[in-house]
Amino acid sequence: METSPPSPGPEPYEPITAEKKPGEKCYTMIFFPTALLVLAAGVLIRAYSDPATHASQRLPRAEIPAQAQFIDQKGFNVLPTVPPPSVSNATTFFVPPGYDAEALKEKPFHVYDEEFCDVIGSNPTLTLIANAGPHPLFHEATTWYPPTDEMFFVQNAGAPAAGTGLNKSSIVLKIALSEAAAVSSRRNATGSVNVQTVDSSPMVINPNGGTNYKGQILFAGEGQGADVPPELIVMNPVEPYNTTVLLNNCFGRQFNSLNDVSINPRNKDIYFTDTLYGYLQDFRPAPGLQNQVYRLNDVTGAVTVVADGFSLPNGVTFSPNGSHAYVADTGANRGFWGWNQSYPATLYRYGVQEDGTFENRKVFAFIDSGVPDGVHCDSKGNVYAGCGDGVQVWNPSGKLIGKIYLGEVSANFNFAGKGRMVICAEENLYYVTLAASGGGYIEA
């Protein structure tokens, strides 16, 4: 991960760094270029050469589509050489025996279990629809607005390549999904859709998470400096894009750096995460609260804590019926402070009680590449997360069933109803067609 130098002052966590020592064994690595991201890894690809393993792979019972490939996990349970943590870690891509980096990207739908075939269907597609060069325009808050069939998203707040954070706010953008579909329909499709800037008024400051909310879009704003507090702010998705602040304090205290937000489909309350990335990226002051998950009842105005005990809580979402919550902990990624591999890169699952509180925290999944950032469910309850190598997918029991493999970091993505998905990958924007439907809450 390439980052800016850390700011003066006490370091909240000690990052792990690795250097090659004299006499240390070298391992063959393929370097793969990546965006300069705040929540992303400067990626190394760790590869193992064993063509025979690839040739003898066992296929699942379901037929594999042309754009998919089966990944035999048993084929890499034992490796001839296992590199040390300085070489193989959360900031690297794992290339199974018999593959190389290009082979993994050539057929980007990776089937780890035949259940994934039901997710992708018989003819899935992955299309690059926009590239922003060195600018991380395609970051988070991926939110579909059905009346205009547009997908909204936000620029990376705090990314050095964008110059955003303390002196300049990140911005809201959108695309028309009709344009994305037109590009995707071409043979060997690649192209560019029109990416429009959304000039909200008053401006949403450093937006990060986003979700549908009563026919509008609800953003989690990270704040800016000591004088602009983090906010939950509602934006009209059509011109004049007027905004209204819903919440900007916890009993008179500033939140640390609001990150993501989701609506529980059962009780309709707002749940959001508060974390340290504004501080770790040098555009927010030292934290004044624990890193926690909050609940807002917008009828009574009551704000309550529903979960704590995180390193850095991040994405949050709910199962389609609202009975379970999923919260990402991206503690391994310390922003400008680097990485601590012993910290969480984990999805947790909670039961949501009838009164809206959380119970029975369980580890749902540990991420093999990067950290789990944005999290969403499909209509069948499968769980998706933006990770270091693309979008990873688990069934409701926490079994990894597949990946939409980009070979680069995705911080967030979202469904656009049935059979469509948009994936944000910082400099790149992708359009996906598949069989699954979104399971998120949308109220017109």
Regions found by a protein language model. Give the residues of each.
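Residue-level detector of Asp-centered blade-edge/turn motifs that repeat once per structural unit
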Residues: 144-148, 212-215, 263-267, 320-321, ...
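Short, low-complexity, Lys/Arg-enriched N-terminal segments of secretory-pathway carbohydrate enzymes
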Residues: 1-26
